Amino acid sequence: MKLSEFVKTEYGKSISECTNEELYYALLTLTKKMASGKQHGNSKKKLYYISAEFLIGKLLSNNLINLGIYDEVKEELAQNGKNICEIEEFEKEPSLGNGGLGRLAACFIDSIATLGLNGDGVGLNYHFGLFRQIFENNMQTTVPDPWLTKKSWLTKTDVTYDIKFKGMTVKSRMYDIDVIGYNNTSNKLHLFDIESVDESIVEDGINFNKEDIKKNLTLFLYPDDSDEAGRILRIYQQYFMVSSAAQLILDECVAKGCNLHDLSDYVVIQINDTHPTMVIPELIRLLVERGLEMDEAIEAVTKSCAYTNHTILAEALEKWPIYYLKKAVPQLMPIIEVLDDKVRRKYHNQAVYIIDGEERVHMAHIDIHYSSSVNGVASLHTEILKNNELHHFYEIYPEKFNNKTNGITFRRWLLHCNPQLTELITSLIGDGFKKDATQLEKLLDYKNDEKVLKQILEIKSAKKMELKKALMEKQNVTINENSIFDIQIKRLHEYKRQQLNALYVIHKYLEIKAGKKPSTPITVIFGAKAAPAYIIAQDIIHLILCLQQLINNDPEVSPYLNVVMVENYNVTWAEKLIPACDISEQISLASKEASGTGNMKFMLNGALTLGTEDGANVEIHELVGDDNIYIFGDSSDTVVERYAQGSYHAAKYYNENAAIKEAVDFITGEELKAIGDKDRLERLFNELVSKDWFMTFPDFDEYVKTREQAYADYENREEWVQKMLVNIAKAGYFSSDRTIEEYNRDIWKLED
């Protein structure tokens, strides 16, 4: 049905007579109707992809693209004087995720549907997400980020489950969002909500009574865990998610006539990081309730589950005190104790026990022992898991460990966010790359085509102008569209080293003040949220915002250097920032970033990577070659060795390296103290000089040198655009379609 016909039926008027808001809701309704007519994957075995977060972004344009009607709708609107981008402004971005974990899950469910596989996502329906970030007095403040409206992509279902906690039973309700594949099937994202949730209990900022479980359970993603009540709330949340998921899985199996002894013939559960780990003991418990012997239930669940590890950071591998579990979900402890006892009888190595000597349950250990597959998300990450972090487990289960390098959906990160580049590529090599991204390699035939290279530069300039306009409209910030756009966008964490970028900004500021001006102006853009309980991360944001105020208001410096931090960074911002970027900052401490996917999105849109040999940067480097990437810093082996020997002392670098000392001293100097918070700046200074746990200082000199080389190379626009083209052409490997094909081939084994 054409939009004009639908609008006539819905509102009794023409497109030109409708408001943009009416048109948005008409398109939403029409899209949902079309999705409901699409076939769902229907193989005997079904995948359940369980994740605490799904950072899906706005859905309207992406769904129209995947339905194959975007151009038609855009044209029909334009003929009636309407702009689809303005209509899209009425859509609220779903607050269902935060960082790379959630964005990966969103890309994966898109690819699962596109490949026609029988698989649904399962998560929670957060009302306020992580939080909405607001900058006040050069500091991050947090407020709820509501997104639910009466008409939305959510569809309320009749599916409800009783979830039993200690001393109370609550009811979960399932809501569905259609996951529309590109010209293929439509699957579901199942989001569970608690029936008794009460948004009114949120008071100042994002504060609420953490012990009022019936009212607070699905309000926020990752509630503040700086106190015991917050940590126990996370257990309630996780169990609520997995118990709902487990009951759904068993109900759907029984409806298909499945013999529960043969669960793995019908079900595969992908556990995305450790947040859904409790699905393993919960499924075992439910199977025993339904008549299976304990050993049978354990075997059935182990064969059905697969675990993806996303981190080597010890703090992110969840370990819950037994006391917490007994307080919230005591029914799981007998199962967990059986699982631990089996491990202890078989392996006499405390490093692999589920329950440690401090009476804590290691969630990742449950996943590894009682799943059939354990995968890392980039080749380097998987090798580090096998040889270092999870080496004891690798010795026991070498056959379980495998690598699945992450990927991104090109439908959103090229077709949707960069239609101009998509159109150019299509005109050169056809549209086969939209379903087979490796076809992008055909672009290499145009590496010396001056006309094509000129068009690529023109598209980049146009995307810079779009970003300039967005920053002016949203934040009243002016940037120079003719400057180098140097961008770092990712959640704020010390290992991602936004502090290293900030130290470079200080270094550059001082150079300009001393009279050394860059050939081309530079705009350094940050986007990041810091967890409310992560004080140093908030201090780093404070430093960046102080630098923004200082530099942008300095008439000597601002013509040559600007700093911008986008407020409330999310998918919508990423879709504007990534196509406009020249230099992609991927500067995590080597060995600490599992993969990263921002690096892939930037590469696909023609940005050049400035990064360490970490995560997927390693594979980008291998694909594009030394001449088309900027690599610096210590190797992962050097970093791991330094940690093992305890041989790194930040103060030594600070005292012996004049450039480091000058930049770090500036943090507590008079210029920043005049506009910043003295305590925050001094705390960050002390953290760097006394600890610098993520080794900013050892990489500083080489980082400065490599970044300056990238800026120098930018001056040769002919060679620079050739590097851009190589990056775009080589990005095809990082399609999430390829990643999902590998998961299915090696782990899930879903039939066509």
What are these regions (language model features)?
Residues M1-D752:
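A conserved ligand/cofactor-binding region detector
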